[in-house]
């Protein structure tokens, strides 16, 4: 099954657990998810999803994530977590901006989240989507979690990504 890292602003998750997200007093996001400007998009990608309040989640042992992964493991044999890099570091854009140009990188929960998952659920079968902009902290998190990543053979022949995707 596919597990997107983020949920929609109008999702049941945000409605029922607002304390788990970066929301203001009117329950609107303070910042939203996206990607910075790059060679593919001069203004970046503005996804618009509310961001998690990682401090609040850490304080309750990442219970929201544990419940989410537990439920999906009951449905699927293997989970592919989309945008895995967001657990190491994520791009936060001020809510209301029209582009991603004013965003900033923030530190994600890192291994602490996955340690909580492993403590509660053992070792669920997870594949980490690790395509795109990867940094050393993302590679270190992948290694610490011991989750397999993804390789797209077509990317091996695209000079923008170098040789990371070559099969040998």
Positions of the model-derived regions?
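Conserved hydrophobic/aromatic pocket- or pore-lining residues that grip, position, or stack substrates
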Residues: 2
